[in-house]
Amino acid sequence: MKSITVICFLALCTVAITSAYPQEPVLADEARPFANSLFDELPEETYQAAVENFRLKRATCDLLSGFGVGDSACAAHCIARGNRGGYCNSKKVCVCRN
């Protein structure tokens, strides 16, 4: 039993050391052509429309409901956005009041 534990520990150490081994640095100029995002390739008017319609997913109600603070966190989130408050609906989505 001790030998299996020692072998597993050595295997774990080997994996940790090899995954932490440094790679060759990549120059920013070489990586730039491959790192274009969709927003970089859009025309200006399409870019503005995409930015205006960009919506972040909200997990305030669903994640914090286990702690009993889902509605309070949703209301605080909505107040921070400039609304009068908010609540969690039956689908666990934060609905902000105007």
Swiss-Prot record:
CDD domains, per database record: DEFL_defensin-like
Record localization: Secreted
Disulphide-bonded residues: C61-C88, C74-C94, C78-C96
Effect of K2Q: In forms A3, A4, A5 and A2 from strain Liverpool
Gene3D superfamilies: Knottin, scorpion toxin-like
Chief place of localization: secreted
Expression triggers: By bacterial infection.
A GO cellular-component term linked to this record: extracellular space
Pfam families: Defensin_2 (PF01097)
Superkingdom assignment: Eukaryota
Keywords: Antibiotic, Antimicrobial, Cleavage on pair of basic residues, Defensin, Disulfide bond, Immunity, Innate immunity, Secreted, Signal
Propeptide segments, given as residue ranges: 19-58
Known outcome of mutating I4L: In forms A2, A3, A4 and A2 from strain Liverpool
GO biological process, any: defense response to bacterium
Signal peptide annotation: 1-18
Similarity annotation: Belongs to the invertebrate defensin family. Type 1 subfamily.
Biological role: Antibacterial peptide mostly active against Gram-positive bacteria. Has activity against the bacteria Gram-negative E.cloacae beta12.
Record protein name field: Defensin-A
Species in which this protein is naturally found: Aedes aegypti (Yellowfever mosquito)
Gene field: DEFA
